[in-house]
Amino acid sequence: FLFHSVPYTELLKNDSLESDEYNKLGTDASLGCVRLAVSDAKWIYDNCPVGTYVKIYDSDETEPLGKPVPMRVADLKIGWDPTDNEKDNPYNGKTPEIKLPESTSVHLGDDYNIYRGVTATDSCGNDITDKIEAIGNVISSRRGEYKITYRVTDALNRSAEQSLIIWVE
């Protein structure tokens, strides 16, 4: 078969995913097949009849549809594909997490970076701090209260949002 999910160590056992192989999604990891996350394999199964024409795009140029960012599993012992919608999947219900700094005050006139001390992890525990978007600003030359809202979305399209009040004193 051209398309298939990442291998499992046991037949019909959703918690037996070869997690190290899952983390190779998006790389040259097999002998010519296209390995997929469960959700992608299921979409093809549900939407593409047998005999559907497949065009393989292999080039150093920008791809016409873009290349999806694969999710990685941080804990290789869990053994589940994070995109599997089975009810027992421990990734179900997990969302990204944003951690904010404890200090929320700035001295008048000090430089302030609204991203300092702000971190984020995805639904699988991977660092996605570089994907954080901030809404708002701090004008450190003017006393007052400033609200910054941080948002992040992971490769599973799950989101988190946290707000922080910064005092310029």
Label each region the model flagged.
Residues N126-A155, S159-V168:
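Serine/threonine-rich, repeat-prone extracellular segments and beta-strand-based repeat modules
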Residues Y57, T121, R151-T153:
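A generic structural motif
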Residues N92-N126:
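Solvent-exposed, low-complexity, repeat-rich "mucin-like" stalks and linkers
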